Swiss-Prot record:
Organism, as annotated: Phleum pratense (Common timothy)
Family: Belongs to the Poa p IX/Phl p VI allergen family.
Transmembrane segments: none
Protein's UniProt keywords contain Coiled coil: no
Localization annotation: Secreted
Keywords from the UniProt entry: Allergen, Secreted, Signal
Lineage, opening ranks: Eukaryota, Viridiplantae, Streptophyta, Embryophyta, Tracheophyta
Protein name per Swiss-Prot or TrEMBL: Pollen allergen Phl p 5.0101
Main subcellular localisation: secreted
Entry's Gene Ontology cellular component terms: extracellular region
Signal sequence coordinates: 1-25
Gene3D superfamilies linked: Group V grass pollen allergen
Length: 312
């Protein structure tokens, strides 16, 4: 449908602007409207208490400048929807936001890409946001005209809040800058971890939505153990990866299997990318030929140091 054309714009707008612990719809003062003549069986949701709006005008990168424009379009769409009859809110929102977001993207994405790392990061984020959008859109399917808009915005707002929890709100930094210190042992096995991640992602993509999380986690751990000769039992023995997952979960309570998988995979991908970038910057050119031997030794030593950790 036409709504799908604006998926990326909508999610990018909120994921980098809204705070991790606040509903975006609440930030805008949005509360589901009460229809003048409610349809049979329809009970509007209780309006959320408006939260303090996120500070504006803090864009420091081209990406954030684009976000501010899209964010303004999103607010305009909510305002437009608030002025029409309940049955017309959903259609009005889509039309208004679609025009604004298309204009913002035309202006903001006209320049050349800044680099492969940024392009890869945007592609990964787009994929996760698209999955969350589908979850929100599915929730609104089959609803009465009066309820569809409320269901769509409420579910979308919660999905965006979860995604925002995995991102840094007012700064878009290169992945390597987000990693403070990574032990040498972890850096030297990152290529194996990256390969294991790809194996797990492939397995999860073929699984039903409700099974993606368990399939991914099991496949990821098995691949890590196999590729390191048993030195690492699971991702939980690699502190940087475990910390990334814990940080993602700390921002929200991911109960739906689809959402849990999205949060989990996004956190791991972000950590692996950061570790990979740090490895490239830290590895001396003269030591390149010794990487394979060093990786085996580091993996064995790290496994010994990990005694007392826990297995899945």
């Amino acid at each position: 449908m036409a709504v799908h054309q604006y998926t990326v714009a909508l999610f990018l707008a909120v994921a980098l602007v809204a705070g991790p612990a606040a509903s975006y719809a609440a930030d805008l003062g949005y509360g589901p409207a009460t229809p003048a003549a409610p349809a049979a069986g329809y009970t509007p949701a209780t309006p959320a208490a408006p939260a303090e709006a996120a500070p504006a005008g803090k864009a420091t990168t081209e990406e954030q400048k684009l976000i501010e424009k899209i964010n303004a379009g999103f607010k305009a769409a909510l305002a437009a929807a608030a002025g029409v009859q309940p049955a017309d809110k959903y259609r009005t929102f889509v039309a208004t936001f679609g025009a604004a977001s298309n204009k913002a993207f035309a202006e903001g994405l006209s320049g050349e890409p800044k680099g492969a790392a940024e392009s890869s990061s945007k592609a990964a984020l787009t994929s996760k946001l698209d999955a969350a959008y589908k979850l929100a859109y599915k929730t609104a399917e089959g609803a009465t005209p009066e309820a569809k808009y409320d269901a769509y915005v409420a579910t979308l707002s919660e999905a965006l809040r979860i995604i925002a929890g995995t991102l840094e709100v007012h700064a878009v930094k290169p992945a390597a800058e987000e990693v403070k210190v990574i032990p040498a042992g972890e850096l030297q096995v990152i290529e194996k971890v990256d390969a294991a991640f790809k194996v797990a992602a492939t397995a999860a993509n073929a699984a039903p939505a409700n099974d993606k999380f368990t399939v991914f986690e099991a496949a990821f751990n098995d691949a890590i153990k196999a590729s390191t000769g048993g030195a690492y039992e699971s991702y939980k023995f690699i502190p940087a990866l475990e910390a990334a997952v814990k940080q993602a979960y700390a921002a929200t309570v991911a109960t739906a299997p689809e959402v849990k998988y999205t949060v989990f995979e996004t956190a791991l991908k972000k950590a692996i990318t950061a570790m990979s970038e740090a490895q490239k910057a830290a590895k001396p050119a003269a030591a390149a030929t010794a990487t394979a031997t060093a990786a085996v030794g580091a993996a064995t030593g790290a496994a010994t140091a990990a005694t007392g950790g826990y297995k899945v």
